[in-house]
UniProtKB/Swiss-Prot annotation:
GO cellular component: cytoplasm
Name under which the protein is recorded: Thiazole synthase
Keyword Ribosomal protein: no
Organism: Gluconacetobacter diazotrophicus (strain ATCC 49037 / DSM 5601 / CCUG 37298 / CIP 103539 / LMG 7603 / PAl5)
Superkingdom of this protein's organism: Bacteria
Quaternary structure note: Homotetramer. Forms heterodimers with either ThiH or ThiS.
Pathway stated in the Swiss-Prot or TrEMBL entry: Cofactor biosynthesis; thiamine diphosphate biosynthesis
The enzyme's E.C. designation: 2.8.1.10
Length: 256
């Protein structure tokens, strides 16, 4: 799958926050065979020595890095954070987050479009964290985005795909745009469902990091993403409102 001209080895993207230890994080990334890891500038900057150790570990994993603007609530804050992240992580990829509501962490679609326009003009390759809003999606594409990352549910909620209709509509309206379900996924079955809907990748963090065994859960998500993709490519049957016999009646004894 190509994202801004770069082919990723896996359709599973993995966040790097909230793990019990750096060693477990490293093992989880390997178990997931992640195509991308997301990182926060705030973590890198939290302590110079700790930040350097974290960044060194991430580099040693050899996985493409997608910095984010997590925690930003204004356009100015998000743009400033993105520029700082480009300097620190040496990449023009940015997962753009502009939070509009503190309780649900719902994206501010108006601010997101404005920030995406500014950052695209500044040479960034923007991965926008968005709602499943069709009009907002169109505006983000017009602003220069070539990837869309709609939420499945609020960040960290584990509720899965709250609005399957909306996610399916996005896929239908933008068949040629890479789409990634980002946020709210709690179980491997949620990830498989996203792939079955036609999405190109999923981004997981809390569901792996906070699991009782993050490394095994990372492997479970890897297998689920693979299963969902294979199922989609196998042309699954459509739902029916009525039963359809699966056993042939030819040759069956008939009573008068």
């Amino acid at each position: 799958m190509l994202f801004y001209g770069t082919e990723l080895k896996s359709r599973l993207m993995l966040g790097t926050a909230q793990y019990p230890s750096p060693e477990i994080l490293s093992d989880a990334v390997r178990a997931a065979e992640a195509g991308v890891v997301t990182v926060s500038l705030r973590r890198e900057s939290a302590g110079q020595r700790a930040g350097q150790a974290f960044w060194s570990m991430i580099r040693d994993l050899g996985v493409p890095v997608l910095p984010n603007t997590a925690g930003c609530h204004t356009v100015k804050e998000a743009v400033t954070t993105a520029h700082m992240a480009r300097e620190v992580f040496d990449t023009d990829w940015i997962k753009l987050e502009v939070i509009g509501e503190s309780d649900t962490l719902q994206p501010d679609m108006f601010g997101l479009v404005e920030a995406a326009r500014i950052l695209s003009r500044d040479g960034f390759k923007v991965f926008p964290y968005m709602t499943e809003d069709l009009v907002g999606a169109e505006r983000l594409l017009q602003a220069g985005c070539e990837v869309l990352m709609p939420w499945g549910a609020p960040i960290g909620s584990g509720k899965g795909l709250n609005n399957v209709f909306g996610l399916r509509a996005l896929r239908a309206h933008f068949p040629d745009v890479p789409l990634v379900v980002d946020a709210g996924i709690g179980l491997p079955s949620h990830a498989a469902q996203a792939m079955e809907l036609g999405y190109d990748a999923v981004l997981i963090n809390t569901a792996v990091a906070k699991a009782g065994d993050p490394v095994r859960m990372a492997r479970a998500f890897r297998l689920a993403v693979e299963a969902g993709l294979i199922a989609r490519e196998a042309d699954p049957i459509e739902e029916r409102d009525m039963a359809a016999p699966s056993t042939p009646v030819l040759g069956r004894a008939m009573l008068a």
